[in-house]
């Protein structure tokens, strides 16, 4: 505040001098020269004073945060304790999950990752933060530092609402789509579109083909499925074998929204954010809104207030599953022993593709283990989504009220105390009583009252699609040198590299 007043004073003095020189009928003599030089000297002195005050204020803040802040006793990167620039660098660079793993390996189970934020690495902490609050205890509300972003400020959807009661109402309104009846209807939709997908793959299969970029085509499949479940109609990407403009716009918008949490942490006002945002982002958003409204208007019972909810369901119900399918395809291709075990299980269980259903795949233990292991290695929501501590003990540490706290699913899933050799793809760790693995530490969809509503739908679609593809085809990785995990980045959603696979109709 002092700095701002100093600079305002400089501006007033300089402006006054300019006005006098412009509009007054001065005779240029020694008095005028003296007057002008006095103004310049005053401006320079005030500017220097303002800079000194700024430096002193900054140093005072840094010293307080490093040595006297309530969280000063916790280890972590010094830059993170002093400024939000540490978060901005890791977040906008797409490396956030990997950076968080590194800092926990360096500093331990409790790390200070911002001036007022702690990151925990333990399944106990995860339960303490995310579980239903006991009666009479205050809940861990979602933090403004992450959830006051984008259009959800005015109309918070089920993910961004911070009010537990509002969340309960929204969850209840959407739950019909994910109850037993809703899942039965979803099974038919998934199986129908998966059969079409397998058929389209056959047109691009064989030894003389360049392969299929499964990173793209799995997106087409999952968006077509969720399009039917959300809007009552498919985007026809699989049947036309090309991406829908609606889907392309949604994915591009999601990627560009990466900078919103960074802007929130840097306290950049919304009007300034709009000024620096690329013009194509706002134009694409407007066009996407128009397409969304058109689709919603065709579905009886959906009203305009559900526009944002529809977009959320589209992203959560499609992109996360598509990422899993691409990732597990790569892992199976890189681990031929696991691929062989899965092929043996699926192909011995079914005598025809028509027997592959949601219920029948639920009985395949190795298939389920492959799904769980894939979700552990690259969870759909890998980062710690901050909650506000009401003043509570988290895994033995009393945390002051108002502190942001979080647990990263990616970090827990790669902790060798819970999962030995965490970077190795080992579906066997999910079969039987493997005492070397603490399976509850893997929570790819979170848990508690704010857990993902579509978890059962995601597992259902993953099992059906993987089983069909393994049953119908032998797979061949085109780019043998591809290191898929080194190329993935997180920009709101997982940004995945191309993954070309040559499919061969299997010998029956």
Which residue stretches match the model-derived regions?
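Cytochrome P450 heme-thiolate monooxygenase catalytic core
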Residues: 139-151, 185-323, 341
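N-terminal membrane-proximal hinge/A-helix region immediately C-terminal to the signal-anchor transmembrane segment
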Residues: 1-169, 191-200, 221, 273-279, ...
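Cytochrome P450 I-helix active-site segment
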Residues: 187, 191, 245-252, 331-380, ...
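Cytochrome P450 heme-binding "Cys pocket" and the immediately downstream C-terminal segment
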Residues: 75, 199-200, 336-338, 431, ...
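Conserved cytochrome P450 K-helix/beta-meander segment immediately N-terminal to the heme-binding cysteine loop
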Residues: 407-434
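Short, small-residue alpha-helix embedded
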Residues: 320-333, 465
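Cytochrome P450 heme-thiolate "Cys pocket" and heme-binding signature region
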Residues: 156, 172, 176, 311, ...
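C-terminal helix/juxtamembrane-tail motif
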Residues: 1, 491-508
């Amino acid at each position: 505040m002092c700095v701002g007043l100093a600079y305002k004073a400089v501006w007033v003095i300089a402006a006054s001098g300019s006005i006098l020189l412009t509009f007054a009928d001065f005779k240029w003599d020694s008095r005028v020269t003296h007057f002008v030089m006095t103004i310049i000297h005053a401006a320079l002195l005030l500017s220097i004073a303002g800079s000194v005050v700024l430096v002193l204020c900054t140093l005072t803040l840094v010293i307080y945060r490093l040595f006297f802040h309530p969280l000063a006793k916790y280890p972590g990167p010094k830059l993170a304790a002093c400024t939000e620039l540490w978060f901005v660098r890791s977040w906008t660079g797409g490396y956030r999950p990997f950076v968080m793993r590194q800092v926990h390996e360096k500093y331990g189970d409790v790390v200070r990752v911002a001036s007022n934020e702690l990151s925990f690495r333990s399944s106990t902490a995860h339960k303490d933060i995310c579980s239903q609050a006991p009666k009479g205890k205050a809940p861990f509300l979602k933090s403004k530092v992450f959830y006051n972003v984008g259009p959800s400020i005015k109309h918070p959807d089920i993910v961004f609402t911070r009010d537990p009661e509002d969340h309960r109402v929204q969850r209840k309104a959407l739950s019909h789509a994910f109850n037993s009846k809703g899942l039965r209807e979803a099974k038919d939709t998934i199986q129908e579109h998966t059969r079409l997908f397998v058929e389209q793959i056959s047109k691009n299969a064989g030894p003389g083909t360049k392969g299929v970029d499964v990173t793209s085509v799995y997106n087409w499949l999952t968006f077509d499925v969720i399009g039917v479940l959300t809007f009552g109609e498919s985007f026809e990407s699989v049947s036309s074998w090309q991406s829908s403009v609606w889907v392309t716009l949604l994915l591009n918008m999601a990627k560009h929204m990466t900078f919103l949490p960074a802007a929130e942490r840097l306290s950049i006002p919304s009007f300034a954010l709009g000024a620096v945002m690329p013009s194509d982002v706002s134009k694409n958003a407007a066009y996407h809104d128009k397409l969304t409204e058109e689709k919603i208007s065709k579905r009886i019972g959906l009203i305009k207030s559900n526009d944002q909810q529809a977009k959320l369901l589209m992203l959560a119900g499609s992109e996360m599953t598509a990422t899993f399918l691409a990732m597990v395809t790569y892992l199976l291709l890189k681990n031929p022993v696991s691929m062989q075990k899965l092929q043996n299980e699926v192909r011995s269980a079914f005598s025809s593709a028509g027997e592959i259903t949601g219920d029948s795949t639920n009985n395949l233990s190795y298939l389920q283990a492959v799904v769980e292991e894939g979700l552990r290695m690259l969870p759909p929501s890998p980062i710690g989504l901050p909650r506000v501590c009401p003043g509570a003990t988290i895994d033995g540490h009393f945390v002051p009220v108002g502190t942001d706290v979080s647990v990263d699913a990616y970090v827990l899933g790669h902790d060798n105390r819970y999962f030995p050799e965490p970077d190795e793809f080992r579906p066997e760790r999910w079969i039987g009583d493997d005492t070397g693995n603490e399976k509850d530490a893997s929570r790819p969809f979170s848990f508690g009252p704010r857990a993902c509503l579509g978890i059962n739908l995601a597992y259902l679609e993953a099992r059906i699609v993987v089983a069909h593809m393994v049953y119908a085809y032998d797979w061949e990785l085109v780019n043998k040198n591809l290191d898929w995990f080194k190329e993935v980045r997180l920009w709101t959603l997982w940004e995945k590299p191309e993954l070309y696979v040559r499919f061969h109709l299997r010998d029956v």
